[in-house]
């Protein structure tokens, strides 16, 4: 079974980790230009928000440029169907990987799933 781009990375590798309110699209573009990590993650995006009325605002967090590749979209939700839809959206948008946030220590996020 192929592990995709992960198999091709030299080790150790440098990753721009997903950080809420930090790794938005403009920040990632600056980092791609001056730091060029081996892997870039989006900040986490609420799958609930994407499909329950906040699509236009949240999809902006999923914009990326070719310079950011490989790029991984990170989502969170407690609803498996919404996670599936978010993953399908990430595939449509051309992401190289999908990450499910299952352990955010932020209390306000914990309550949301």
Name these PLM-found stretches.
Residues 6-8, 63-68, 107-110:
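A short alpha-helix capping/helix-coil boundary motif
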Residues 2-3, 19-92, 96:
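Glycine-rich, positively charged N-terminal anion/phosphate-binding segment
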Residues 44-51, 102-113:
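Glycine-rich, proline-tolerant flexible connector loops at the mouths of alpha/beta enzymes
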Residues 2-3, 8-14:
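Extreme N-terminal starter segment of soluble prokaryotic enzymes
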């Amino acid at each position: 079974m192929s592990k995709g781009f992960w198999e091709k990375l030299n080790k150790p590798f440098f990753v721009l980790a997903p950080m809420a309110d930090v790794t938005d699209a403009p920040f990632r573009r600056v980092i791609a230009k001056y730091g060029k990590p081996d892997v870039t993650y989006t900040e986490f995006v609420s799958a609930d928000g994407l499909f329950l009325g906040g699509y236009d605002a949240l999809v902006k967090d999923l914009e990326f440029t070719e310079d950011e590749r490989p790029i991984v979209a990170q989502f969170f939700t407690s609803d498996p169907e919404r996670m599936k839809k978010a993953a399908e959206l990430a595939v449509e948008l051309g992401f190289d990987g999908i990450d499910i946030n299952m352990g955010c220590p932020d209390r306000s996020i914990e309550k949301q799933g």
